Amino acid sequence: IWLNGEFVNWDDANISVMSHTLHYGTGVFEGIRARDSKIGTTIFRLPDHVDRLFDSAEAYNLKIPYDKEVITNAIKDSVHLNNLSSAYIRPLVFFGEGEMGLLPKSVPVYVSVAAWNWGAYLGDDAGNQGVRVCISKWKRISPQSFKPTAKGVGGYMNSTLAKVDAVE
């Protein structure tokens, strides 16, 4: 896992339970797919994902301490170093430990990139057999509450509740 500028073993990629993001949901992320192709492993729309990560971070007042080139290379290297040809990649920008409260002025910003093998999102049989769907009792969060184009950690609680509701 790439963590704050260097690669570390998965077991060593730890953060404090006092991370501001853990308490307040103040982080942003991307979900990126890499696929095996005729020309080797390709990462789907990588520049677009990196741009959105930076836009999301700006919307949440997270100052990423690296430029887009560094993050792009960390994403590519995460796939390569983990020997993955088809993968899910999760860059995450989050506040570390420090002062608590709703204004994390002096809290450090951390960045991680993890990549792992992940097959078909809805299962291997979904393409042939289809999937069951439902309408959740949970409503989408209003765009006046969260920036809808930003992938904010806290904003995904709504999606988690809807998924749990659908599965149950």
Where are these regions (language model features)?
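Short, internal active-site loops enriched in acidic
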Residues: 94-99
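Short secondary-structure capping/junction motifs at helix and strand boundaries
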Residues: 63-68, 80-92, 122-123
